[in-house]
Design a protein with these regions (language model features):
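Juxtamembrane proline-rich low-complexity "stalk" or linker regions positioned immediately after a signal peptide
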Residues: 23-38
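Surface-exposed, charged secondary-structure patches
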Residues: 79-140
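Low-complexity, intrinsically disordered terminal/linker segments enriched in charged
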Residues: 124-127, 132, 138-142, 159-177
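Core segments of small alpha/beta cavity-forming domains
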Residues: 37-96
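Sec-dependent bacterial lipoprotein signal peptides
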Residues: 1-15
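Bacterial signal peptide processing site
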Residues: 17-20
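Hydrophobic/aromatic beta-strand elements that line small-molecule binding cavities or substrate pockets
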Residues: 120, 144-150
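A general "mature secreted/periplasmic domain" signal
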Residues: 150, 154-156
């Protein structure tokens, strides 16, 4: 009984801290006001899953759009679990090439002539979505699926699925196990 009361009180406190839903969906134009790059990605991550995905790919169309890479396992575009796996993969590599040695968002190490062809987002709940993405990079058309989760107020990538390969989380788990 006591545990139930504590759980109810905790949920009530969380609900009281949440903004009304109408406020959360209003700033749809905010990402367009920012230049491509991390600030635009972070702002778009607060708006919705499709805006977040489009901002992720907008940086690949601009040379150096992401700026300096962040430390492995500390990138706010990935959820906590994926960041933990990326960090563990890098640490386990101990100076050698880690399993994740490319940008999983574009499945590439470099981008040239990058153009986003389509994004189709399917939201399976208030905190989960999948984005089927088609883009051209270096003359090659690629398709992949981003699994997305909402952590706090921001959408984040929780997994990357490339046809014909194991999911990114499966590859990383195999490498760090």
């Amino acid at each position: 009984m006591r545990l139930s009361l504590i759980a109810v009180a905790g949920l009530a406190a969380l609900a009281a801290c949440s903004p009304p839903e109408s406020e959360a969906t209003q700033p749809a134009d905010a990402p367009a006001a920012l230049p491509p790059g991390r600030p635009a990605i972070y702002e778009a991550a607060r708006v919705g899953p499709e805006e977040f995905v489009r901002a992720l790919y907008a940086v690949h169309a601009t040379a150096g759009g992401m700026g300096e890479p962040l430390a492995p396992g500390q990138d706010p575009i990935y959820d906590r679990m994926l960041n933990a796996m990326i960090g563990a993969d890098f640490a386990q590599a101990a100076g050698e090439v880690p399993t994740l040695n490319h940008d999983p968002i574009c499945d590439c190490q470099d981008s040239e002539g990058f153009s986003l062809q389509s994004v189709a987002v399917t939201q399976s709940g208030p905190t989960a979505a999948e984005a089927a993405v088609v883009f051209v990079n270096m003359g090659e058309t690629k398709r992949l699926t981003l699994k997305l989760v909402k952590e706090g107020p921001m959408w984040k990538v929780s997994d990357v699925l490339v046809p014909g390969r194991p999911a990114l989380t499966e590859q990383l788990m195999a490498a760090i196990s």
